[in-house]
UniProtKB/Swiss-Prot annotation:
Catalyzes the reversible conversion of 2-phosphoglycerate (2-PG) into phosphoenolpyruvate (PEP). It is essential for the degradation of carbohydrates via glycolysis. It is an enzyme of class 4 (lyase). One of its GO terms (biological process) is glycolytic process. This is Enolase. Binds a second Mg(2+) ion via substrate during catalysis. It comes from Paraburkholderia phytofirmans (strain DSM 17436 / LMG 22146 / PsJN). Keywords: Cytoplasm, Glycolysis, Lyase, Magnesium, Metal-binding, Secreted. It comes from the Bacteria. It catalyses: (2R)-2-phosphoglycerate = phosphoenolpyruvate + H2O. Mg(2+) binds at D242, E285, D312. Its cofactor is Mg(2+).
């Protein structure tokens, strides 16, 4: 039995300099698991609640000492002595201890830190790499990365309304080669921006944040960077968008301030369809407001057979909401953010539900990250096929890519890279 003998919670800083929660779990054998949780900038209203202190005189109210105290007191008391290898039972214990629908009492940040740290300790105890502990012998597929090379919206201080413009390397035989492709396109884009006298400062997720005049101009420039790096747009590298449309939906209209447009749901669906016709876009995330289900249905009917339509704020990694979306034919993919739901067991349930319904699942970071690379192991362990973890700069993003390189090396000849087949529900 891998009995838990000690739990230590602490307050650390994330990549934005804001406090977040880290947890150490020590087992009877002396093995330890350590995990740190991320935090988002654009958040869905139905996400599990991360507990913040609210003391304005300390970290602007963003401290997490209350969440840490919960770990070091009642969570510690509840799980002390439990078997770390019984993840589902441990997560159930946390859920019952919290007792709320949205984890608002203990805080999803406290609960997730413990859930992840326990899994890491159990994997160490079993002598298994984390991805293998999660997925068993069937874990051998590396994920296709969506690399956020231009930031807009809530992630950058510029005039772009769409939050993320991503490149998706798909023709490469290995993850290592896909990562190289992404890095080369990133540096080609930097040179193009520099030559134009545009900003090469980066946003929260490591992508550039220049002031383009329109989304079209931004996408056209990315195509130039792909070609400059020696790759073929639409063949070697595809494009993906995260609209984060909930951020610019006001008074029943999609208000693209950067382009001076105010669009209805149908008009915005047409706007996105036009972009998908002009550019090799394979995936669009949060293309409608999280509560605009009629708009989502319109978008899905219009684009759902040829473009991956990812629900992030829409589904918030929640199986109850995902089930409703599947039944209504809304979107065709779910973004998986572990801190949106707050335990590993619930995260894995969302991935499995999506797969059973023929939806894809994209494992994702948050804009406020740490050096913790657990999501890389989840992507491989659960055979998700896709990961979204930022640009080719900032060590908080690169830590996940580097972990995937290590996993691919560890897998050796049995490692596979799915490329375009990761988008298995498109025609």
């Amino acid at each position: 039995m891998s009995a838990i003998v000690d739990i230590i919670g602490r307050e650390i800083l994330d990549s934005r300099g804001n406090p977040t929660v880290e947890c150490d779990v020590l087992l009877e054998s002396g093995t330890m698991g350590r995990a740190a949780v991320p935090s988002g900038a654009s958040t869905g209203s139905r996400e599990a609640i991360e507990l913040r202190d609210g003391e304005t005189g300390r970290y602007g109210g963003k401290g997490v000492l209350k969440a840490v105290e919960h770990i070091n007191t009642e969570i510690s008391e509840a799980i002390m002595g439990l078997d770390a290898s019984e993840q589902a039972f441990l997560d159930k214990t946390l859920l019952e201890l919290d007792g709320t629908d949205n984890k608002s009492r203990l805080g999803a940040n406290a609960m997730l830190a413990v859930s992840m740290a326990v899994a890491k300790a159990a994997a160490e105890e079993a002598g298994l790499p984390l991805y293998r502990y999660f997925g068993g012998s069937g874990a051998m597929q590396l994920p296709v990365p969506m690399m956020n090379i231009v930031n807009g919206g809530a992630h950058a201080n510029n005039s772009l309304d769409i939050q993320e413009f991503m490149i998706v390397p798909v023709s490469q035989p290995t993850f290592r080669e896909a990562l190289r492709c992404g890095a080369e396109v990133f540096h080609a884009l930097k040179k193009i921006l520099s030559d134009r006298g545009m900003s090469t400062a980066v946003g929260d997720e490591g992508g550039f944040a220049p002031n383009f005049g329109s989304n079209d101009e931004c996408l056209s420039t990315i195509l130039q960077a792909i070609e400059k790096a020696g790759y073929r747009a639409g063949e070697d590298v595809l494009l993906a968008l995260d609209c984060a449309a909930s951020e610019f939906y006001h008074d029943g209209k999609y208000q693209l301030a950067g382009e001076g447009l105010q669009l209805s749901s149908t008009e915005f669906a047409d706007y996105l369809a036009n972009l998908a016709d002009k550019f090799p876009i394979v995936s669009i995330e949060d293309g409608m407001h999280e509560s605009d289900w009629a708009g989502w249905k319109t978008l899905t009917d219009k684009l759902g057979k040829k473009v991956q339509l990812v629900g992030d704020d829409l589904f918030v990694t929640n199986t109850r909401i995902l089930k409703e979306g599947i039944e209504k034919g809304i979107a065709n993919s779910i973004l998986i953010k572990i801190n949106q739901i707050g335990t590993l067991t619930e995260t894995f349930a969302a991935i499995e539900m999506a797969k059973r319904a023929g939806y894809t699942a994209v494992i994702s970071h948050r804009s406020g990250e740490t050096e913790d690379s657990t999501i890389a192991d989840i992507a491989v362990g659960l055979n998700a096929g896709q990961i979204k973890t930022g640009s080719l700069s900032r060590s908080d993003r690169i830590s996940k890519y580097n972990q995937l390189l290590r996993i691919e090396e560890d897998l050796g000849d049995i490692a596979s890279y799915p490329g375009k087949s990761a988008f298995y529900n498109l025609r």
